[in-house]
Amino acid sequence: MADSHPAAYDAVADAYSHALDPDGVGLVDPVLTELVGDVTGRDMLSLACGQGQDARLLASLGATVTGVDVSTQMLRFAGRHEAANPRGITYVQDDAQDLAAFAEQSFDGVVCHMALMDIPELASTLGSVARVLRDGGWFVFSIVHPCYRGHVDVVTDYLLDHRYRKRLATEWLPAHAYHRPLGTYVEQLTQAGFRIERVVEVHHQAADAGGVPGLLYARAVQA
């Protein structure tokens, strides 16, 4: 992982925690909930969990949840929410690109919500996810849609894998992310031993977005 990556999230942890789920009640995301399905009694990993909003969602659905993140400060906020309202969530600091803290076949499912595009090495991350999943396990993730940014878009370097600096009006997101063509995600999921089961494109809510999908969700199962 790039040296600046943990520091980038540590730097925005306070603003991030106050902007997203400040009361610690858990994420509300119908698409994610549908793709996850019934997780009652299942062992779940919330990958790149940040301050724990996705972990709290999974716990509210009846799962036994472990949250993992590279950022010390993000996990500090996650721990505060857990202490204030215990849900039985365990938080671990580790790198999503190797998940060295976890043994093989530790989890029934892995969820990575709006973070996969911020992790430098996709192939090693997907390989780590596959390693910690049990037979028949699944991986649900969401990303900023790699194809569209607005209802009118000039495509210049879509086919290139590259790091880019976001221009954001908010102070609670790191400035850097990694653009990858949709085909890269498909190819590397396949190489990691996954079969894509569902893809859901969610359009922008802004009135001027013209219904263009801004987010992409997917569920992949071990082939």
What are these regions (language model features)?
Residues 192-194, 207-223:
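Core SAM-dependent methyltransferase catalytic element
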Residues 43-98:
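Class I SAM-dependent methyltransferase SAM/SAH-binding core
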